[in-house]
């Protein structure tokens, strides 16, 4: 049976069930998806229809919606707009003018807005001017209240209450008011109608900073108070208005529950003592933080005023609660709708306080004639609450706190707090902390105090050092305050014990230590006066005190002056021995080096006359006089003079100065000493000279014994003895040859060692003294170096190899190879065999010699020396070959470039034809020139 036959039933049933459920699932999914898509489409279509019905384009819809939302948001902000856009409040029935105008006629003659009437019902036009935009609104309310009697009115939101700053429907003084920019949110200036009896509002005394009126001198004090109260929300409370009282009771008293709506309306029947109030209430300039309220209809600061009122009320509720009984009775003419704002921002200035009055101070009582009463002193601080003063009940209308505040002005709160200047206080505190936290200055003060103690003895002992050093720290200590010095005096005791390493040394050890430092400068100053003319003289006087060796002056041509200077400096320094010990060590070495350089550069004649006398004196100072033989300076002076003379001549004769050692090896045995001096003078102004000088220094006594060899043999003999003391017996000629070879090698190899061991000054001086006869033989050895006798060197090298190290022989052989090849170049110039130009010379005597010396080919004559050179020479010739191969490439490029550079100018007939691809490779621009230049060439020739 097949698999299908056995399982076809189960398979078919499974497929059927799977297909069935799959179909159901797909159908369900399709239906749900269709429904969802259809629903979404319908919704979107409805939305589109709605949008299309409203507007044509979605962009406009979005823009309009955004604009609407944007407009909705700034509604609160627009309350801050200029109140000029709003009309002035209408006069209440029975009111000929605004309440403020009747009571007070400002000198401006402008009827104040109802805010004055609201506060005090004062008709003074100046009060209108004084009234800020919020005030006329408040005035309306107080006017109504005045007409209505005691009518608790919640003034509309400040924006609503406050008429536009510029708007003056009535004979309003808004225009004249400079405080229009200063909105008075709550300026319930309560002013009793009776000028003598009451000042309606203590608000006036507490200048509400928000609406403080810097405007006309005779604005209603209530308005002024309101303006001030804006900036001084704490002074919101309406002070009881006692016309007889010149004080403006604290605004808190008048309106303990003064809110934005709170307004104490002065009774209209009450006579308005605004002129008195004007006198009493001096116009207060708006505080810095005063915020200009927008049009009274705008609820700009209501929320903020409410907050301020709540704060002030909380501060003032107790006095206000005390006055609450009076508040229904209180007849506050100056209390206007602004009064509600005043409790928040500040005490409403009583209408009696006239802005015309000169009271610019925030806390200044608005009443001119009357001093502030009831604890209403002029309030410099905006938020300072004043103690509430009971309002006269007869004059007080019941006041309804108006909590309505449509405008939120949190920034107003910030502004009054900012003028309080809390920030500068921490700034002031920070410098104080910094001044107190200055521990380091006491340490310096201690130094200064110690130095103050030092100058007296220092003037005796070390006037140069301690006086200068003490004076500077003394200045520093003087700069520090006396208190700091006193504190430092106490700290010095503690710190000197705790920090003896610092303060103790400054007190005690510093007296010893500092003098050397300044005294070094002092030494410089003292001898500098004598020796500024010559830098060498400065170093010389310093050297003898260092070693305390004053006798060295005997080598003397120019030492007499130096010794005198040294003696003078020593006499000056006798008092300060340790200082003299400290100073000289660095300076003498430095100056000696400079002297060596100067002497080496100087001409040989100058070296003989000037340098020789001075240097042996220095050498004697540095070295004991017993160790220095008298013959040394002579041999050195002669050798150095000879070398200096050698330097001039061989440099001119020989183009390759860097490789003089090779030539010296190739030189004859008799002239080897001369060649040594010559190449050393040429090549190793550093190495060759120094090594030979040192050799002469150490072995000059032997050179004295060897008078036959004279100055020539001194250096090589002494040098060979240094390197290999075993073969002292070889003949003088052999010694000279060996010295010529080994001295060069040793000078190049061990020059540094001798330089370190022995100062170069002595070598230069002795060489100069001993090198008088050297210059004439120097010229001779050079052709002898080129002579065929160069083969003799390997023989002598083998002799030396037996007695000396083979390494020296190998090195000398290498040097000979190098020099021989380059001597070939010199021979070419001299007229020698031109065949030598090639690294492999044509077979000849010279060629054989070169081969033997190099060891590359069978060296018949010097077999013993071959062993050492075989190892080394292959490396050297390779280097030489490379060097020889490289320089010809460079000159080839240079002439090509040189030829090419002038040719583009001349270019152009022969050049374009002569130069081919090689030129193109060198200068790609020339190809371009070839194509272009011929035309230009024609032009140029035409011009020519």
Swiss-Prot record:
**Pfam families this protein is in?**
AIM3
Per the record, membrane topology reads: Peripheral membrane protein
Q: Where is the composition biased (Low complexity)?
A: 93-105, 130-158, 245-267, 306-318, 625-640, 664-673
Which portions of the sequence form the region Disordered?
A: 1-331, 349-805, 821-901, 916-944
Q: Which residues carry this modification: Phosphothreonine?
A: 726, 858
Q: For bias kind Polar residues, which ranges apply?
A: 166-244, 349-362, 461-470, 760-771
Family, per the entry?
Answer: Belongs to the AIM3 family.
Question: What does the UniProt entry say about where the protein is found?
Answer: Membrane raft
Q: Which residues carry this modification: Phosphoserine?
A: 57-58, 64, 471
User: Keywords, A to Z?
Assistant: Membrane, Phosphoprotein
Query: Assembly and interactions?
Result: Interacts with RVS167.
**Cellular component annotations (GO), alphabetically ordered:** actin cortical patch; membrane raft
Residue ranges with Acidic residues bias: 59-69
Which residue ranges have biased composition labelled Pro residues?
A: 374-390, 859-876
Would you tell me the protein name for this molecule?
Answer: Altered inheritance of mitochondria protein 3
Ranges of biased composition (kind: Basic residues)? 36-54, 885-896
